[in-house]
Amino acid sequence: MKVILKENLDNLGHIGDIVKVAPGYARNYLLPKGLALEATTKNAKALDHAKKHLEYKKNKVLEQARQFAARIEGIALTLSHQAGEEGKLFGAVTNMELAENLKAQGVEIDRKKIVLAEPIKQVGDFTAIIKIHPEVNATLKVTVTKA
């Protein structure tokens, strides 16, 4: 029996693939759980239309992510922390602190999306990577000064 997959399945294929499976597997598992549709011309046309719509939405989200990344890259954060004689900070600058400072500047982002290559424990200039979308990353410039 031929079916059209509605979801990615490790053992069968990806969304939209037309695969041949055992009739019992299709009737008892794939179709009742909504993982696949019977492969008819009507269902194939409906799936093509849904694919085009999803592609349009994906491109729109990607463009919004790129605009958001450009907005973030235009920001330079300056933080002042207490530091010792040699510029070593008492504590460290965390991604949570960076998220709070970005929020104060009108850019709200989840702290888990901010990636620091290494903890910021010195006075100086640093960069942080912000993962906005699986295909779009932004670079944030962070300057830490002595308070």
UniProtKB/Swiss-Prot annotation:
Binds to the 23S rRNA. GO terms for cellular component: ribonucleoprotein complex; ribosome. The keyword RNA-binding applies. GO terms for molecular function: rRNA binding; structural constituent of ribosome. GO terms for biological process: translation. Keywords: Ribonucleoprotein, Ribosomal protein, RNA-binding, rRNA-binding. This is Large ribosomal subunit protein bL9. Belongs to the bacterial ribosomal protein bL9 family. The gene is rplI.
